Every structure is written in structure tokens, then in C-alpha cells.
Amino acid sequence: WCGAALTAAFAFSPLWRKKDPEQGRVLTLALFAVLAFLPSSWASYTLRVYRDNIFPALCLYFFAGMAGMALRAVQEKPAPLWPWLAAAGAGLACGYLDREDAGLFLLPFAAAATGIVAVVLVGKRRWRALAAQLIPYVMLGAGVLTFCTLNYTHYGVFALSDFSEGSFAAAMGAMMRVDTDSDKPYL
């Protein structure tokens, strides 16, 4: 969690770039402290390492990466966006692999942020930065492909999850469907 909080603190540092450098450092440190010491991040049930407890940190990595990229895309002086896109891609890929329903939370935000920043980058004619917008999605695809390949090499099944695809999902679906011999709708 602390690594994600530190990434977020540096991601938002362009917001106070016009302030005194010393004051900017204090604000960055304050944002880190606020995020690192959130009560929800230090609750006893979140200190165990399993998927529900690491998902907020993965989301924070993703959102910090996208915010850091967006804040640097609108600057007058062009700044490299790829490090922030790589952080967003790592958070997106890990979050997507951590929870099956992460696509419902993360992908719409990713698409909206990418679209908005793409409009800004086209207006500024920053074509390389526009192409770099694909980095999070390439990292997501590479992560899913790697995970499926590992499942295939170890278990012989090229699938992301047995619960949502493959023979287990088909068997569960067959057991859950009700089959009646009657063709009367209310019987």
C-alpha cells in the first residue's frame, strides 16, 4: 500500500509545480502521509495478504498512473508519459488478474481517461505520446496471455479462470439449468 501511496503522491505533484519547491515537497509528503495512513489501509483485516486486501493498492497504482499521465499531458513543457502509463498498466494488469470483476471497475475508467488524453495529445500534435497510450492495454494483454499460458503449461487448460470459462463453467451451467419435460409455461 505504501508503494501505491508514494506513486500517487508523485503522480499529483504537477498540481503544485507553480508553488515554491520547498512547499511542493511538503505537499507531496503530506499527500503521501494521508494516503499511507488511511484508516482503511491499516485495519487489521487488511493486513493479511490475499486478493481482496491487495486490490485497493492495485487500483491506486492504476489510478495514480493514469492521473500522473494526464497531469503531465496537459503541461506546456512536454514530459514523458510512458513511466506513468507503465505504472497504470501494471496496476491494470495485476488488478484485472486479481479479481474477475475488475474489468467492470477499471476498464471504463481506463477507456475514458485514454480518450480524453488522446484528444489533448492530438491537439498538441504529440504523436509518440498518443501511441504510448496503448502501453496499459498491451501490458494487460501480456499479463492475461502470460497467465493463460502458465495455466496451459501446468494444467493443460488455456484459460484465465476455471470458474468463468472451460469445462468447469460448462458443467456448472448444465447443473444449474432446470430442464422440465412439460411444455406448459406455468407448470
PLM-predicted stretches and their roles:
Residues 1-2, 34-66, 94-111:
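Multi-pass, polyprenyl lipid-linked donor-dependent membrane glycosyltransferases
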Residues 24-27, 79-84, 121-139:
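Membrane-interfacial entry segments at the cytosolic side of transmembrane helices
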Residues 33, 84-99, 140-147:
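Membrane-interface alpha helices of multi-pass inner-membrane proteins
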Residues 136, 140-187:
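Juxtamembrane membrane-water interface segments immediately following transmembrane helices
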Residues 11-42, 46, 85, 89, ...:
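Transmembrane and membrane-interface helices of multi-pass
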Residues 1-22, 61-65:
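Transmembrane-helix motifs of polytopic, lipid-linked glycan transferases
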Residues 15-23, 70-75, 118-123, 154, ...:
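Membrane-interfacial segments
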Residues 62-83:
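Membrane-interface transmembrane helices that cradle and orient dolichyl/undecaprenyl
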